[in-house]
């Protein structure tokens, strides 16, 4: 072994070593190796603000073995023969710098290589063209890391103290939560109206086609009047217009457009998309997946062009060079594309293969000819209808589209032809069915993961490497959740004219589906309001985007890291110092919903430690108040007295088990459940108000069966051998011990269990600090 190459991931190491040959040994750092310390031994701050934000780093405990192995190999080959091949973004550059520090490698001379695809040509070319660690990129990454750490370290304690149920606040995820909250409130304020849209099914030469009236009616009466006016009418073609058109392909994928399209077409979350893309990149199947460039290399364009001509013919090939609109994009990087455009199957994993196929087809389409279309509009006059004079002339319009040359649609986003019959001006067509259907204006759409990524990109918030993390974090914190409702039924009026008479019917449609949509939780709304009121800069879109721009300036050597950090920190820290004066009792206002008719006590909707809840009675009363969760979908501002009274009917006795134990149905922090003795059983998606005894017994029996399978052995002193989420283990209630892989858990005796328990030092239980709350009245404000 003459050379040592250090990469980030073990999977990538194997692929690269295969290309480099016997003179190179490739090892992995397994991602980041150091992070800013949480607490120093001597009490000094982890980030010294007065000393130009100097940060103290420590090797992550789980990486100590990795570092030992790397040091041994560095010593074997010599420092001059070490190559740092971490990823080509700022995070990768920072990892290279940390490796230099930990492995005592000279930053000025240690060879640094980058490549945006794991192919033999790319790796060989990188070895021929090494550089050194780019300290501007390192400084930009450190600025982001320090800033985010300072915001989290100083702002989160304020959130814990002042916001009921508050968990944390972050520099980038907080504006994302605000976006979702603002959209939700737009939806809540939206006042829709309805109109009647008229459509007709016409017939000509035994071919049916659809047409739409060129006006809508505001009332049922007006729509009904129009349909009745058609009883003596004839329908005559008055105009036929044909317009040629073209449709051009989209650019190859960037990180954000890949996440948007994978969410839209495949239903993938941003996190799942990036996990699959990472695997495909490490396997050498696609180029680097964190990029904001739409550029393709000349070699990639040539390969795609050759493949298109061979497979589809020269008419399908159109060479394009896309330009990135983003000023911060690095054109030296490439868009996400296959490393071998001829390869159709890249993975045995169905998710990875679906994503690869999407990337491959998008890349091919970007170098293919436009699709050619012919759009046809047929105008149909109504002759002889008896509408009163002065009414607007009504005409039907039928629109069709024929693809005369499919071009890029051959591989990406194909459409079906919308065919119309061959007609001439003056032809009469027969009406088969004419319908006036009530339609409703739609509120603004809730964000999906894909559309939120698009909005964040438009606002300049976040970068390719952070979008998936932002969306994952706001959900993990409990500020945002994914909806699962199919929507609520809504009555729709339908008027139908069959050529003789007008009939009226009511049909139902679903409205307001939240499936797959991102919805802010009450805690998310509360934190967004709190930050907007007291820490405006943290949730201000322009400010957050400007911070991202300043990171870009540091990376481009156009701004000093310390100057940027001082500019942000001084006003931010001043707000932290002033936060002591914020009155917690005024954060998240209480609302009296009404009076309980049974007890004559007020029912109050308010925020508690775990989020919004209902309270029956005052905290100052001699009798302790009762508590209940808000009904699903209700808010403090909107919950009704009727809904609240229903919640206080819980817990409800559903009936008894076969051995006579009460089955109680209730709702807790984690949703609806039944309780039998000390056993709790989730009943999602059942309603605790209406779950039947039969269903409750069925779920209880299934839980007992699962518990029985979990218990391998139980001894008289309380020691148990159990099947757990991560495998079999022994517990005495205070300490858990994993059973060695070579040991069959069914053979463990009481003596052996005690031996294993005593051989393992118990991990100290972290004491939860309970905040002392000041007793305040919850009377209506």
Task: Please annotate each region the language model reported.
Residues 1-145, 154-155, 214, 313, ...:
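Intrinsically disordered, low-complexity regulatory segments
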Residues 2-3, 15, 74, 132-133, ...:
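Basic, low-complexity terminal or inter-domain segments flanking catalytic cores
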Residues 10-13, 30-36, 88-92, 116-121, ...:
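Conserved nucleotide-binding/hydrolysis micro-motifs of P-loop NTPases
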Residues 118-202, 242-246:
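C-terminal or mid-to-C-terminal helical accessory/interaction module adjacent to the motor/catalytic core
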Residues 218-251, 259, 424-430, 437, ...:
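Metal- or metallocofactor-binding catalytic centers and their adjacent structured scaffolds
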Residues 237-240, 248-262, 287-291, 443-455, ...:
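Short acidic, hydrophobic short linear motifs in intrinsically disordered regions
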Residues 261, 265-269:
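A conserved hydrophobic secondary-structure block that centers on an alpha-helix together
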């Amino acid at each position: 072994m003459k050379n040592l190459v250090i990469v980030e991931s073990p999977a990538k190491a194997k692929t690269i070593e295969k290309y480099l040959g016997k003179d190179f040994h490739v090892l992995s750092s397994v991602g980041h190796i150091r992070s800013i310390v949480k607490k120093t031994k001597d009490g000094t701050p982890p980030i010294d603000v007065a000393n130009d934000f100097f940060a103290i780093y420590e090797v992550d405990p789980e990486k100590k073995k990795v570092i030992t192995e790397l040091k041994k190999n560095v010593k074997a080959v010599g420092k001059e023969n070490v190559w740092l091949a971490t990823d080509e973004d700022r995070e990768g550059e920072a990892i290279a710098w940390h490796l230099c520090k930990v492995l005592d490698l000279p930053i000025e001379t240690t060879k640094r290589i980058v490549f945006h695809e794991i192919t033999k040509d790319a790796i060989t070319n990188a070895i021929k063209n090494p550089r050194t660690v780019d300290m501007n990129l390192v400084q930009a990454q450190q600025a982001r890391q320090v800033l985010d750490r300072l915001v989290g370290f100083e702002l989160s304690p304020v959130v814990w103290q002042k916001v009921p149920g508050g968990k944390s606040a972050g520099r980038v995820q907080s504006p994302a939560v605000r976006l979702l909250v603002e959209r939700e409130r737009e939806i809540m304020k939206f006042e829709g109206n309805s109109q009647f849209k008229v459509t007709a099914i016409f017939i000509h030469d035994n071919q049916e086609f659809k047409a739409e009236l060129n006006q809508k009616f505001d009332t049922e009466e007006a729509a009904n009047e129009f349909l009745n006016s058609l009883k003596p009418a004839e329908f005559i073609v008055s105009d036929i217009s044909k317009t040629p058109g073209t449709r051009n392909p989209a650019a190859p994928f960037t990180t954000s457009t890949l996440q948007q399209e994978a969410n839209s077409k495949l239903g993938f979350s941003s996190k799942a998309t990036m996990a699959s893309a990472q695997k495909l990149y490490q396997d050498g199947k696609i180029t680097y997946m964190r990029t904001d460039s739409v550029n393709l290399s000349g070699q990639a364009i040539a390969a795609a062009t050759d493949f298109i001509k061979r497979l589809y013919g020269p008419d399908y090939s159109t060479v394009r060079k896309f330009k990135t609109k983003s000023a911060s994009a690095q054109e030296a990087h490439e868009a996400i594309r296959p490393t071998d455009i001829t390869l159709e199957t890249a993975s045995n994993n169905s998710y990875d293969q679906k994503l690869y196929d999407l990337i491959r087809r998008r890349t091919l389409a970007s170098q293919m000819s436009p699709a050619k279309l012919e759009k046809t509009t047929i105008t149909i006059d109504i002759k002889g209808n008896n509408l009163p004079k002065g009414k607007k002339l009504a005409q039907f319009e039928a629109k069709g589209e024929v693809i005369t040359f499919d071009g890029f649609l051959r591989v990406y986003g194909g459409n079906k032809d919308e065919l119309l019959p061959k007609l001439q001006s003056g032809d009469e067509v027969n009406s088969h069915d004419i319908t006036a259907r009530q339609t409703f204006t739609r509120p603004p759409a809730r964000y999906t993961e894909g559309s939120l990524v698009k909005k964040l990109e438009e606002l300049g918030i976040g970068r390719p490497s952070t979008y998936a993390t932002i969306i994952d974090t706001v959900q993990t914190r409990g500020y945002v959740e994914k909806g699962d409702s199919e929507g609520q039924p809504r009555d729709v009026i339908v008027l139908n004219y069959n050529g003789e008479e007008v009939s009226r019917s009511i049909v139902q449609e679903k409205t307001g589906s939240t499936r797959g949509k991102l919805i802010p939780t009450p805690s998310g709304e509360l934190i967004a309001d709190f930050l907007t009121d007291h820490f405006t800069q943290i949730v201000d879109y322009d400010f957050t985007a400007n911070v991202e721009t300043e990171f870009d300036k540091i990376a481009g050597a156009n701004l000093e890291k310390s100057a940027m950090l001082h500019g942000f920190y001084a006003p931010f820290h001043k707000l932290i110092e002033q936060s002591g004066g914020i009155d917690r009792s005024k954060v998240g206002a209480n609302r009296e919903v009404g009076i309980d008719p049974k007890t004559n006590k007020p029912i109050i909707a308010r925020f508690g430690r775990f989020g919004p809840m209902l309270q029956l009675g005052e905290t100052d009363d001699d009798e302790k108040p009762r508590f209940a969760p808000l009904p699903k979908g209700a808010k403090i501002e909107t919950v009704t007295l009727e809904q609240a009274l229903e919640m206080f009917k819980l817990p409800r006795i559903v009936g008894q088990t076969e051995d006579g134990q009460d089955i109680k149905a209730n709702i807790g922090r984690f949703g609806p459940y039944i309780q039998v003795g000390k056993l709790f059983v989730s009943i999602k998606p059942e309603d605790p108000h209406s779950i039947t005894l039969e269903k409750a017994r069925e779920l209880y029996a299934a839980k007992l069966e699962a518990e029985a399978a979990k218990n391998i052995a139980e001894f008289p002193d309380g020691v148990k051998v159990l099947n757990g989420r991560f495998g079999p283990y022994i517990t005495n209630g205070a300490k858990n011990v994993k059973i060695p892989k070579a040991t069959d858990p069914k053979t463990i005796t009481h003596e052996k269990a005690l031996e294993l328990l005593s051989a393992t030092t118990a991990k100290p239980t972290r004491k939860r600090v309970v905040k002392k709350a000041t007793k305040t009245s919850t009377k209506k404000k």
